[in-house]
């Protein structure tokens, strides 16, 4: 699933490709793509026609396009087109005459008749919805915490909240109400960089260790963002269809059985929450008590 760096790459592409443009037509090719828009596909499309895209924003793994209020004297805050990429979602800005992708789910045409926006999703776990009055922050994601690269993220509050949890470190990092945008890849990479085991009980972590972990996650995510994100199977691509290159820089994730670049020990792969965790047994010693 795309995590913060990948979603931010897409957000930047949307900012370049669709902000300032007015929606002329919306085609819904697969109802599951708009299942979160409870009023239905026809209402979804009608809600967007004539709307101008004012902003492209993100919180954690969610994206939204803030729309300009369309009626004089109407609400001061516009609606939002809220999206989540799920496991395989892509938002592509492509020439209008380019062939349709096999898994095209929603098409957006604009009044300038330039490049169109397409939502493509092979596994259909992603989705789009229009949120009334949600241009600043859509209500369905208001409970999600700021992400570690956000200017309003509070490191001290994070450290205190982390240490009050009664869970394992990686479970805490995946909790989007504590810190958003971190998924399996960057949790493993951040924990390796901070030399902390994923099952370490959060209540045993010192303030200094919590801040070190946060700094490690930020550093890894910043590097991933600079590389265009991580692409394993080409399901994640930018709005231009370009894969990320950070896979080449991963230290532990997906490298079970290989040598740790820091100490040459063999990287472990453990089952974790119906997925996998990768760690170095020497650099990240397993605590006696785990969660």
UniProtKB/Swiss-Prot annotation:
Catalytic reaction(s) noted: Hydrolysis of DNA containing ring-opened 7-methylguanine residues, releasing 2,6-diamino-4-hydroxy-5-(N-methyl)formamidopyrimidine; 2'-deoxyribonucleotide-(2'-deoxyribose 5'-phosphate)-2'-deoxyribonucleotide-DNA = a 3'-end 2'-deoxyribonucleotide-(2,3-dehydro-2,3-deoxyribose 5'-phosphate)-DNA + a 5'-end 5'-phospho-2'-deoxyribonucleoside-DNA + H(+)
GO-annotated molecular function: 8-oxo-7,8-dihydroguanine DNA N-glycosylase activity; class I DNA-(apurinic or apyrimidinic site) endonuclease activity; damaged DNA binding; zinc ion binding
Keyword Disulfide bond: no
Cofactor(s) this protein cannot do without: Zn(2+)
Pfam families per record: Fapy_DNA_glyco, H2TH
Catalytic site: 2 (schiff-base intermediate with dna), 3 (proton donor), 61 (proton donor), 275 (proton donor)
CDD domains the record matches: EcFpg-like_N (cd08966)
GO biological process: base-excision repair
Entry's family note: Belongs to the FPG family.
Subunit structure: Monomer.
HAMAP family for the chain: Fapy_DNA_glycosyl
The protein's name: Formamidopyrimidine-DNA glycosylase
Organism: Parafrankia sp. (strain EAN1pec)
């Amino acid at each position: 699933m795309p995590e913060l760096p990948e979603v931010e790459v897409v957000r930047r592409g949307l900012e370049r490709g669709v902000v300032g443009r007015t929606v002329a037509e919306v085609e819904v090719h697969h109802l599951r793509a708009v299942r979160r828009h409870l009023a239905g596909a026809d209402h979804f499309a009608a809600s967007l026609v004539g709307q101008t895209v004012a902003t492209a924003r993100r919180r954690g793994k969610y994206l939204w396009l803030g729309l300009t209020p369309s009626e004089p004297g109407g609400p001061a805050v516009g609606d939002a087109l809220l999206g989540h990429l799920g496991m395989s979602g892509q938002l592509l800005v492509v020439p209008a005459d380019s062939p349709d992708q096999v898994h095209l789910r929603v098409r957006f045409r604009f009044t300038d008749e330039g490049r169109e926006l397409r939502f493509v999703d092979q596994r259909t776990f992603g989705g789009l919805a229009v949120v009334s009055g949600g241009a600043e922050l859509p209500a369905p994601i208001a409970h999600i915490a700021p992400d570690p690269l956000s200017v309003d993220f509070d490191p001290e509050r994070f450290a205190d909240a982390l240490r009050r949890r009664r869970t394992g470190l990686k479970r805490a990092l995946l909790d989007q109400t504590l810190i958003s945008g971190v998924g399996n890849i960057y949790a493993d990479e951040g924990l390796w960089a901070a030399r902390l085991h994923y099952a370490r009980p959060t209540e045993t972590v010192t303030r200094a260790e919590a801040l070190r972990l946060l700094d490690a996650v930020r550093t890894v995510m910043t590097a991933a963002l600079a590389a265009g994100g991580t692409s394993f199977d080409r399901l994640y691509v930018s709005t231009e269809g370009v894969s990320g290159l950070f896979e080449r820089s991963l230290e532990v994730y997906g490298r079970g059985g290989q040598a740790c670049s820091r100490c040459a020990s063999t990287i472990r792969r453990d089952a974790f929450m119906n997925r996998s965790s990768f760690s170095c047994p020497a650099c990240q010693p397993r605590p006696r008590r785990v969660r």
